[in-house]
Amino acid sequence: HYLIKKGKVVNKMGLEEYKGVYIYAQQVDNKLSDIAFELVGKAKELAADLNTEVTAVLLGSNVKALATELGEYGADKVIVVDNPALETYRTEPYAQALVSVINEYKPEIMLVGATAIGRDLGPTVSARVKTGLTADCTKLEIGDFPINAMPGQEQKHNQLLMTRPAFGGNTIATIACPDNRPQMATVR
């Protein structure tokens, strides 16, 4: 796809260029957090519905050994960004690293744990890659959006449907991000 703007041809990113279900594999003190394994499991379910792969993104310093553990739990691929600046969690270096991975590899879905770190990292990253983020999801599934399309309304298929509590937990909302990639969520 190309966009012609004032005589210049600008490459326009098509949604079909985004592939795979990615998870941020949180580690603290070079030990993987439980949420990393939980996200790999959920990502495997979503990836099966989309006929794609699960990629774990591991950020830190001297963390390469943890990649094997993620593979044993079901990640098809592990991208390791190993840098002394990532020894302990700080928003800016971690956000820069995750944004660069997203920009290079173009995941269709990016899941982050709804931990203190994930609640800081997720919104920062989603803003920088210009996509939405659904926070504190309790259910994720692949489906059509809008769920109950009106006659004549276009329905998009294979969307990430993200369910979360709304209005103080009195109701639930199912949210989709049909026009932007990656589809991002923090997951409880």
Residue ranges: model-predicted function:
Residues H1-R188:
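N-terminal glycine-rich FAD/FM-binding segment characteristic of electron-transfer flavoproteins
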